[in-house]
């Protein structure tokens, strides 16, 4: 399907600065867009932490937060005020600070981080809400939300209502500080197939609401740190399991290299687990004394996250395509993003009406995922740019009987017709994709959709971008097409019949086809009164008649007298 190049609007240019992809906007607009996105994130953040309600999917929030930091770095702004963490309104001090975890981008980064050390453990990165549990004299005395890592909210009363969290401990755990993740308990959750399910927001909502405390029993705990616990990790896991924190032992594996980390990561991504995860955490077996723990300084652990199921992508331009039937489709060109191993640069929005309903303009941020067969799909608009400059779509004068002949306004539908006639459903011209048809048409200025039949081997060879081997292949394909049966040529002319109906009709010549009545067409498979009328309109169209005469002059089977 061709693209309406002349109607592209608002193409955004991009450049790289310090590894970031930066929008090339006037400085005033850049600062304004940063401020607007920062305010939007702050509003979502406030609702999330104060009301326990998520106004946006967790993954979308995380990706937009990262994009804000990226933009701020592009213009040299301080990123410390970026609202990617909860408000600092907790007043209960953590006995041991939460360090957070550094993010590693890929297997190579994991291998580099592990270099020089020999013993590591890998665990699922459980997606929930972080908490500190304080046990004194064998009893749970305090539970503190992560907050800013140094101080958080007192969640003791809520945590005591979660039946899966032990209220008493013995032995080394009788007086201990534990850090972990409160998560939504699930049965048979397969991360790759089911995604994040907004689990983090659901957990936060349950912990912050004053009512419906019975729902807290659907929560569980995964302990990922025991500051100043047993030096031997195996012993540490064993004691946690005996105390009722069994998940930590079950989902912790000793690893020696990045390959083993990758194997565990893949296994947990595709296996049934009791919680949502968003990657893995690799921990060095030896960690410093808790007195040295500080937010942002946990150098002995790192995370390797899963690629998101959906990516936030920036719209760089809006384009229009016209199919062979005259249908206009809208396409969003994107600043490229990776989904699985696919580089996504564009997504089909659909009809002009659907595009107008979505209200998408260059500069907007949209959520894109992969549908069946790896086709990019638009899921939602997650943030709109202040500037709403949109292109004007082409007129609606295109239909199934237009653009068999080339003209300035017919450029895209004409190319779409060429692509169609070269497909296996019509003449089966191997090696003839849209780019090849464009090159031939731009060089040799076709009059109509069959003008290529008149090209000589020398003319094909002189087409820019055509190597000798390709030129010879195309020449052979064009010659072979002359031997195709009449029905194939009629399909190439876009007769409004299915192949099955055309075969059932039994027509072997243009003369036979001209003699058919609407009653005959109506009797064919999948051909009602409306389609029969379309066939007659197609057959009687002056452009179609002219093409049939031209094919007769070329001695195409079924068109001669």
Curated annotation (Swiss-Prot):
First-level EC class: ligase
GO BP term, pick one: DNA repair
Annotated keywords: DNA damage, DNA repair, DNA replication, Ligase, NAD
Known role: Catalyzes the formation of phosphodiester linkages between 5'-phosphoryl and 3'-hydroxyl groups in double-stranded DNA using NAD as a coenzyme and as the energy source for the reaction.
Catalytic activity: NAD(+) + (deoxyribonucleotide)n-3'-hydroxyl + 5'-phospho-(deoxyribonucleotide)m = (deoxyribonucleotide)n+m + AMP + beta-nicotinamide D-nucleotide
Source organism of the structure: Salmonella arizonae (strain ATCC BAA-731 / CDC346-86 / RSK2980)
Gene: ligB
Membrane as UniProt keyword: no
EC number: 6.5.1.2
A Pfam match: DNA_ligase_OB
Name the UniProt record assigns to this protein: DNA ligase B
UniProt-annotated catalytic positions: 125 (n6-amp-lysine intermediate)
Cytoplasm recorded as keyword: no
GO molecular function, one term: DNA ligase (NAD+) activity
Superkingdom per UniProt: Bacteria
Family per record: Belongs to the NAD-dependent DNA ligase family. LigB subfamily.
